[in-house]
Amino acid sequence: MLEEIDKETVDLSGFKIKIDTERYSPRMVEALRTGEYEAGERRICEEFFKAGDRVLEIGSSIGAVSLVLGRTVGVENFIGYEANPELMPDALENFRINGLPLTYHTAVLRNRVRGGAGGMIDFHINQDFWISSLTWVRETIRTVQVPVLCLEDEIEKFNANCLMMDIEGAEYDVLEYAELDGINKIFMELHYWPSRDRANKMLKYLINEGFTVDLDMTAGHSLALIR
């Protein structure tokens, strides 16, 4: 039996993150090596969320931001969801080598108005894994089926008061018309490229629900909302 070859490891925000140079695209490898990978999100979320916040992260990927969240709010106060099932082993390994046993599920979350829980949905994987999404593009290398869970149910079960999101434009479907009782902080990467009109509609809905933009914690496409 051949021994597993040790993967390259980089330091991001004080955590060891493994790089799979065979599976990750050159662009992803470079972003991880230079520290560019989710740099803004990692920096801001450490200030935006506080110890004791209950954070539900959507789009946990390989766990780099998840680790920062776990350190900030406490392991027991974090739960993560990622649609790409191929990233779960990577995230769990990153959690293991850093000694933070964070909870992580493979699923797509939808609010009740958009269909809620039940069934499976197509998820399109890109070698640049940070742009894998529910939308097929020419760079899609394969499509997998992923279970759908209800956002409101998961919020209630975990008693979350905070949402962290980076889901390549799907934030519109997740947040617009969502019942966000109990949520007082949202931090997301806002993707304008799919549709500015839909982004504006989502923001109008959230503002009407009592959220305001926290300008001190908002930078570039990283948007912080509080109420």
Where are the regions that the model predicts?
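Phosphate/nucleotide-binding beta-alpha loop and adjacent structural elements of enzyme active sites
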Residues: 1-227
